[in-house]
Amino acid sequence: MNTYNCIADDVKLGTDVRLSKFINLYGCEIGDETKIGAFVEIQKNASVGKCCKISSHTFVCEGVVIEDNVFIGHGVMFINDSYPRATTGDGNLQTEADWKVERTVIKKGASIGSGATILSKIKIGANAIVGAGSVVTKDVPPNAIVAGNPARVLRYIEHTVEGHNEHF
């Protein structure tokens, strides 16, 4: 660790986790042999599995579950509230107690391209690939390749060879 990181006491780090500079981690769990890039924030009640790569400038909000062997590209944004508002119905500024955190799950072996936005209550299936810049508004099936705004299925991965997906 270095002096440029903010890592709260309640963070659970696995073995051989590699942390870049300028990261914020609090109340989260990071699995073994995972690499966290620069300028990443991972909030409380989020978890990242083992052997993952979370690239720079990514925001992983509360309630996101990232399983093992997942790749997250640069600048990926996770959203955890379907109806965000600044104030309550009576005009008062919302507090943490006013927000409803909605869970998002990224299944084992999935890859999310740089600049993608993943909306709340989404499940990205095992080995799925989300194209760069996509906006994911609904669940992605396992082995699907999706892209666009909103993200749509382009095709499916045919088979796996030695633990790696064959895309074409």
Locate each region found by the language model:
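A C-terminal cap/extension of S-adenosyl-L-methionine-dependent methyltransferases
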Residues: 132, 167-168
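C-terminal/domain-terminus segments
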Residues: 122-139, 143-145
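Flexible, glycine/small-residue-enriched loop-and-beta-strand segment within the central core
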Residues: 1-9, 19-122, 150, 156-158, ...
